[in-house]
């Protein structure tokens, strides 16, 4: 018996389909179907995932889509060939682009004029099975039209079937079996019910007729299909399948080609740009080694026809530089000297051991991947440039699939099952991001619920099933698809939630599977901060205008790093990096490259950190098994740290080709997911034995490579980041006021909150002054400091005030530059402020110079007439109602609630006078305590981290009035104090002090932390304070 299934919703028909596309295809293969059509509603979002599984199984996949038109007619459109696929994709694009995100609008006229070659299955209903509709469909699609019949074993189907037969006979329409499958197996019916309830924002018990009438909407065994449908209707499924011969493999990407001047070939234009760039990079002459690498790269680029790709990225980067937007390529592209000469990347060949095979490989036969970071506050300028240059028909962002995670699954499933909302909320909040779904049992038991109850068991099962289900499409962080022809010829395009952006329906993995080009236009906050720092510094030190003006290898900068004074510094400001810095003690740029890469899961899991540090301290000899291995590992003292080293070792020690070594890299990247790395073990070890290495060493080396897993950090990536790391370090060391000021103006970014940055700035002796209408600019700014320690103070800007209109803030600053404000009434009149603007300024104490205190400012702001015409230049009368100044505690609360920080006393400075905080040590006192001593500390919770390499250990950062306290919480302690650990704003921690012991060869600064034994939540003492921590960053 033969059968092709033609009507399938996967879970990419969001909140209707109850199975993944791959599950649908695999089940069709197991059931012996000849073909299966994936027909998600106005979507091809699941098509690639279905295609990959179909290729693996060897079953025919038909690409199609279901539509409900504006006249309520329903149909399926299937793509028989490449031209029809482009029509279908374009039709989906049209329907999606004319509606809001997540919706679509399609009309019958659209269908007639735009789907000229697709096969159409009309799905009549009781309301649409009319003579008029039959006449319209028949006239429009003629020999490409079928009348679809679904038999779901529901009431009234026999009467409808007779009606459909009459229409089919009248208009000579062949009838075809069109059984709607919402799930690959009947066992998913409860989940499908839950999805329906979520879709309708209600519970399953309240759905009524909106539920599927039974559980028949699944892929049935072929004998069941033959029982349900006449043979003639099943035969038509096969005839349709025979006509549908399109495969997604037919999609071919074409690069944009208008970037090449007339009369030049693409490679000639690229060579000319490279020649110009290398003359600027090496004004004294190009080194012979660089010339050789360039010749090799350009030859391979020409052979693989990647010229247009490089020209496209070059054009985008050139635009950014013309607009003074800081940008820098990173990742594997930093292995390319061509990218260096095009000023896409900044890593010179001599700075690292470039490995072009990591970037482009002939054997790999896939496009290269260039990631470029841009200033996060100006990246939108670059994005809109791309849209303008190529048009929205030829450029769109890649999608990201937003899927259910534990917390969202608990909330939605709980609501759908009608569970107590308070219980559902408690469970969702109590489940940390690292918890497995199985831990939900513990959380429910802790809430006093009997887990053996049937409803609770069903809840567990449904939460497990829905995790990983797609919820909706969002936009990728910056992956652009840019094409020579219309993007919609390849993949449908829809509106993003952000105005001015469009998104394709495929994600990064889909694009990789199809070999389609993606240019990553990424956002990096540190680039914004660096540009703003340089702009401020340049005003008083003209010699420093760009990153290129920063002196290299500055000893004072490295002294600062060795002391772990890195709050705000790019890439090395985390707890783990601060702990490593005094041990590694970087003194050169390459040391920074290693520092950034070594605090990663790969080197840690591969047991590479401690051997490297011992060798660096001279406590362990450095040895190499051969000169070839020495060439690879000498920069890292014989210990493999970088991903490129693993690739090189496979080539020089085990005899792998460049392509084989790259496949090894890919296996390393997916090792944690599927264990593919083990298939290389025998080849690797045998190759090493053939090259004369000992078996024990071969096994040991492979184990180290295996330890990299998916976490081995590329040297090229680390080196790109090290450039920004050094630049931010130098600026913090030599121009700290400008650096901190720029960080405040570049939020949100980085590891630390504005409050923490200000605390650190003040510890460095930099005065920080409050927002004030007679002194502040829109953004925070530098002003001369009356201090012998520093020439500059930071004046906080209006952007720190929550909810203040940015245009109003700019007007205040612009008008004040002409003449200071005398009173609040004049401020309102001259700057055109609303009463709401004034109230926000008063609440933030930004009217202090005009009113004296918050209470007076509130009263005076409230007394200002709203009509601008009634204002005059006279100040308010001197006998205005007197209002007592607020208390320090109230001022502190208002500060945090309006600006997220306070320049007054730290909250701990007030609490310190009370029990039990009076018994707690301050951060600055910890350095004088001995290792192992019992200690109590208290502070605001500013950060929680749980790195994957820490074996379940959680790290807390507490802030008191003297600094940051590092707290280590072992796994056993986490469970006992879980609620306090996850939700508290103010903690007292009781535990033991631990301090690292410097090695015999160094006087490095010891790292101090508290190992928690008890965690006591005192958040109620700060209930009115708007505090937020940066958790698991």
From Swiss-Prot:
The keyword Cytoplasm applies. GO terms for molecular function: 3'-5' exonuclease activity; DNA-directed DNA polymerase activity; nucleic acid binding. Pfam families: DNA_pol3_alpha (PF07733), DNA_pol3_finger (PF17657), HHH_6 (PF14579), PHP (PF02811), tRNA_anti-codon (PF01336). One of its GO terms (biological process) is DNA repair. Its EC number is 2.7.7.7. The keyword DNA damage applies. SMART domains: POLIIIAc. It is found in: Cytoplasm. One of its GO terms (cellular component) is cytoplasm. Its main location: cytoplasm. It catalyses: DNA(n) + a 2'-deoxyribonucleoside 5'-triphosphate = DNA(n+1) + diphosphate. It comes from the Bacteria. It is an enzyme of class 2 (transferase). Belongs to the DNA polymerase type-C family. DnaE2 subfamily. DNA polymerase involved in damage-induced mutagenesis and translesion synthesis (TLS). It is not the major replicative DNA polymerase. This is Error-prone DNA polymerase.
């Amino acid at each position: 018996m033969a059968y092709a299934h033609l009507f399938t919703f996967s879970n990419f028909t969001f909140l209707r389909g109850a199975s993944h596309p791959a599950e649908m295809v695999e089940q069709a293969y197991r059931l012996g179907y000849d073909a299966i059509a994936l027909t998600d509603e106005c979507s091809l979002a699941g098509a690639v995932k279905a295609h990959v599984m179909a290729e693996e199984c060897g079953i025919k996949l038909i690409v199609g889509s279901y539509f409900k038109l504006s006249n309520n007619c329903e149909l399926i459109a299937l793509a028989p060939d490449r031209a029809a696929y482009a029509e279908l994709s374009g039709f989906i694009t049209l329907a999606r682009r004319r509606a809001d995100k997540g919706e679509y609008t399609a009309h019958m006229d659209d269908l007639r004029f735009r789907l000229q070659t697709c096969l159409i299955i009309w799905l009549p209903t009781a309301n649409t099975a009319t003579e008029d509709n039959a006449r319209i469909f028949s006239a429009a699609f003629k020999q490409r039209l079928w009348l679809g019949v679904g038999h779901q074993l529901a009431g009234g189907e026999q009467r409808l079937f007779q009606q459909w037969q009459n229409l089919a006979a009248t208009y000579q329409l062949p009838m075809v079996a069109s059984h709607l499958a919402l799930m690959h197996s009947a066992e998913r019916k409860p989940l499908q019910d839950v999805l329906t309830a979520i879709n309708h924002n209600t519970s399953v018990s309240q759905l009524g007729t909106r539920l599927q009438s039974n559980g028949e909407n699944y892929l049935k065994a072929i004998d069941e299909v033959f029982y349900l449908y006449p043979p003639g209707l099943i035969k038509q499924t096969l005839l349709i399948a025979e006509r549908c011969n399109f495969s997604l493999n037919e999609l071919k990407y074409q690069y944009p080609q208008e970037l090449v001047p007339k009369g030049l070939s693409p490679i000639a234009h690229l060579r000319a740009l490279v020649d110009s760039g290398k003359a600027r990079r090496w004004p004294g002459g190009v080194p012979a080694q660089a010339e050789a690498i360039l010749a090799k790269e350009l030859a391979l680029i020409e052979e693989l026809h990647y010229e247009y790709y490089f020209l496209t990225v070059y054009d985008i980067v050139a635009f950014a530089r013309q607009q003074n937007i800081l940008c820098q390529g990173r990742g594997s592209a930093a292995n390319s000297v061509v990218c260096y000469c095009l000023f896409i990347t900044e890593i010179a060949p001599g700075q690292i051991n470039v490995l072009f095979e990591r970037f482009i490989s002939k054997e790999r036969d896939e496009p290269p991947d260039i990631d470029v970071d841009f200033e996060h506050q100006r990246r939108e300028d670059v994005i809109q440039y791309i849209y303008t240059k190529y048009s929205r028909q030829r450029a769109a962002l890649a999608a990201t699939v937003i899927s259910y995670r534990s917390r969202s699954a608990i909330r939605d499933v709980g609501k759908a099952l009608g569970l107590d909302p308070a219980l559902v909320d408690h469970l969702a909040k109590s489940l940390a991001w690292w918890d497995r779904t199985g831990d939900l049992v513990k959380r429910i038991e802790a809430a006093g619920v009997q887990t053996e109850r049937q409803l609770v068991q069903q809840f567990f099962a449904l939460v497990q099933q829905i995790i990983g289900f797609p919820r909706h499409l969002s936009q990728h962080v910056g992956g652009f698809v840019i094409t020579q022809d219309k993007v919609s010829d390849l993949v449908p395009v829809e509106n993003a939630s952000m105005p001015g952006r469009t998104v394709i329906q495929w994600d990064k993995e889909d694009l990789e599977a199809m070999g389609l080009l993606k240019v990553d236009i990424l956002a990096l906050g540190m680039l914004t901060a660096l540009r703003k720092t340089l702009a401020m510094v340049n005003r008083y030190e003209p010699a420093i205008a760009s990153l290129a003006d920063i002196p290299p290898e500055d000893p004072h900068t490295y002294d600062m790093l060795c002391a772990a004074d890195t709050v705000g510094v790019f890439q090395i400001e985390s707890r783990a990096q601060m702990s490593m810095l005094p041990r590694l003690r970087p003194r050169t740029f390459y040391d920074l490259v290693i520092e950034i890469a070594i605090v990663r899961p790969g080197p840690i899991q591969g047991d590479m950190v401690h051997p490297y540090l011992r060798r660096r301290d001279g406590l362990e000899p450095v040895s190499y098994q051969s000169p070839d291995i020495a060439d690879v590992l000498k920069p890292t003292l014989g210990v493999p740290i970088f991903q490129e080293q693993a690739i090189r070792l496979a080539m020089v020690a085990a005899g792998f080709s460049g392509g084989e070594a790259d496949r090894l890299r890919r296996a390393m990247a997916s090792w944690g997911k599927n264990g593919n790395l083990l298939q290389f073990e025998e080849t690797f070890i045998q190759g090493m034995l053939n090259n004369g290495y000992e078996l024990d060493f071969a096994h040991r080396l492979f184990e180290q490579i295996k330890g990299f897993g998916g976490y081995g950090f590329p040297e090229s990536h680390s080196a790109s980041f090290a450039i920004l790391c050094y630049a931010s370090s130098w600026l913090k060391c030599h121009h700290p006021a400008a650096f901190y000021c720029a960080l405040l103006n570049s939020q949100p970014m980085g590891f630390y909150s504005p409050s923490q940055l200000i605390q650190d700035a003040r510890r460095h002796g930099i005065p920080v002054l409050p927002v004030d209408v007679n002194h502040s600019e829109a953004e925070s700014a530098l002003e001369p400091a009356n201090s012998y320690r520093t020439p500059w103070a930071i004046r906080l800007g209006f952007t720190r005030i929550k909810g203040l209109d940015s245009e109003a803030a700019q007007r205040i600053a612009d008008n004040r530059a002409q003449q200071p404000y005398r009173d609040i009434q004049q401020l309102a009149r001259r700057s055109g402020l609303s009463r709401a603007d004034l109230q926000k300024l008063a609440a933030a104490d930004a009217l202090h110079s005009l009113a004296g205190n918050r209470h007076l400012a509130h009263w005076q702001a409230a007394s200002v007439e709203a009509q601008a015409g009634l204002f005059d230049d006279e100040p308010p009368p001197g006998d205005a109602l007197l209002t007592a100044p607020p208390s320090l505690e109230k001022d502190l609360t208002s500060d945090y609630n309006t600006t997220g920080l306070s320049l007054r006393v730290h909250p701990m400075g007030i609490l310190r006078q009370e029990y039990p905080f009076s018994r707690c040590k301050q951060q600055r006192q910890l350095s004088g305590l001995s290792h192992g001593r019992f200690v109590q500390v208290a502070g605001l919770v500013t950060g929680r981290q749980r790195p994957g390499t820490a074996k379940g250990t959680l790290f807390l950062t507490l802030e008191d009035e003297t600094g940051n306290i590092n707290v280590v919480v072992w796994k056993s302690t986490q469970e006992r104090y879980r609620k306090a650990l996850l939700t508290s704003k103010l903690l007292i921690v009781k535990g033991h002090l631990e301090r690292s012991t410097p090695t015999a060869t160094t006087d490095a600064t010891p790292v101090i932390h508290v190992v928690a034994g008890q965690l006591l939540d005192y958040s109620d003492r700060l209930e009115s304070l708007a505090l937020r921590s940066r958790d698991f960053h």
